A protein has these predicted regions:
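N-terminal strand-loop element at the rim of the active site
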Residues: 10-14, 31-69, 236-239
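Active-site proximal beta-strand in glycosyltransferases
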Residues: 89-91, 104-139, 143-145, 161
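Conserved donor-binding/catalytic core segment of Leloir-type glycosyltransferases
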Residues: 186-214, 220-224
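A charged, aromatic-enriched C-terminal amphipathic alpha-helix characteristic of glycosyltransferases
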Residues: 316-324, 334-365
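Acidic donor-binding loop of glycosyltransferase active sites
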Residues: 260-274, 287
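Short His-centered aromatic/hydrophobic patch
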Residues: 92-97
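Nucleotide-activated donor-dependent transferases that construct or modify glycoconjugates
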Residues: 1-19, 204-207
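Nucleotide-sugar-dependent
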Residues: 210-214, 269-279, 291-302
């Protein structure tokens, strides 16, 4: 299988530094393709790190902040490589307009596989552009994939959300055409059945600092209230104010080692159907999530653990009340070892290696 792989543009690739949901998607797709021995042309950056993963690396510069110049260079590289290779698939994660156009110019739209993880937010210019390009990919004959049933359900609501920034979106086309394929992509691959450990008193937060979509300030207020029984992790690119004592840029392996002994994981992203990477990893180890969620909303977390604790709010709930409600739920949370085992077993059944390979195989033969 010959694949052109065009990464998410936020950070250079490093399998030990997964900084968010989109980077986790990136990691999981690439891991599958490497595992089946695909011949991968990876259009990335000078500071990508692959370890022993075998790819043909085509860097377009050193990434500190993604620039328009890099986008043009990437577009030229797509067309150049397409001129000398035959590709079975082109893989993207929420590509730019220039990338989508270059894929079309190269005659590769029909083999374009795009993986989504960012919820629609009509007042965010960057997110509006991402979804506008997802519509364009569909128009061009490419295919886009969602991580969960909840995300696909939200997509049918997103197509009625507008703002002053969405005037270029073709809503008539979008409302008439669901953008995602019926098959969800796997969000994790478990090579070995996780050992379920008894819980300590530790409760962890492991999400970037974002007070709007992720409500991380609510999470870190709960961590503060826990004292020595709370631990917050953030990447330096999205670090919180100094008043929050968090651990910055810890290796992914270090976070996972502590997580498997945690009493619970905090998740304060209340209204998305996407996957918070640490949440699925926690549940796979039997560790429950304490989920902040808007009333009557679906959430990806509930697809993996239907017994997840829901802390329900609505969009008009004052922040002080949200903090109080969530912190109370965190401080009063209890669980059992039997529940941890049940939680982990359900995720293992769905995402063991054989099941995941079958899911990817289905996507990459469609």
């Amino acid at each position: 299988m010959k694949v052109m792989f065009i990464p998410s543009r936020a950070v250079p690739f490093n399998p030990e530094r997964v900084q968010g949901g989109l980077e986790a998607v990136h990691l999981n797709v690439l891991k599958y393709l490497v595992s089946i021995g695909a011949d991968i042309d990876y259009i990335g950056f000078d500071n990508d790190t692959f370890g022993d993963w075998k790819v043909n690396h085509h860097p377009v510069g050193h990434l500190t902040k993604f620039s328009l110049g890099m986008s043009y260079t990437m577009a030229r590289k797509i067309v150049e490589l397409a001129g000398i290779n035959e590709y079975d698939f082109v893989v993207t994660m929420e590509p730019t307009k220039l990338t989508v156009q270059a894929i079309k110019d190269a005659g590769l739209s029909k083999v374009h596989k795009n993986f989504m993880a960012t919820p629609f937010e009509p007042v965010s210019r960057g997110i509006v552009q991402i979804w506008d390009q997802t519509i364009q990919i569909h128009k061009n004959g490419g295919k886009s994939y969602a991580p969960t049933k909840a995300f696909r359900e939200f997509e049918r609501k997103y197509c009625y959300m507008t703002s002053g920034l969405t005037d270029k979106i073709d809503y008539d086309y979008w409302r008439a055409n669901p953008l995602f394929e019926a098959e969800d992509y796997p969000v994790i691959c478990l090579n070995d059945k996780p050992e379920v450990l008894p819980a300590t008193d530790l409760i962890i937060s492991a999400q970037r600092y974002d007070t709007k979509m992720r409500r991380t300030d609510v999470a870190l207020e709960a961590i503060k209230a826990l004292g020595e029984n709370g631990a917050g992790y953030c990447p330096s690119k999205w670090a919180p104010p100094a008043k929050y004592p968090v651990i910055i840029d810890a290796p992914h392996s270090e976070i996972m080692e502590r997580l498997k002994m945690a009493k619970a994981l905090i998740n304060t992203c209340p209204d998305t159907g996407t996957v918070e990477n640490s949440s699925i990893e926690a549940i796979s180890k039997g560790v429950p999530v304490i989920q902040l969620v808007f009333k009557d909303y679906p959430h990806a977390t509930f697809e993996y653990d239907p017994d997840t604790v829901r802390v329900e709010i609505d969009s008009s709930t004052p922040k002080k009340e949200v903090v109080a409600l969530y912190t109370k739920a965190v401080l009063e949370f209890t669980d059992t070892y039997e529940a941890r085992v049940k939680r982990a077993e359900a995720v293992w059944k769905k995402y063991n290696r054989d099941a995941v390979v079958a899911m990817w195989d289905k996507i990459f033969t469609a």
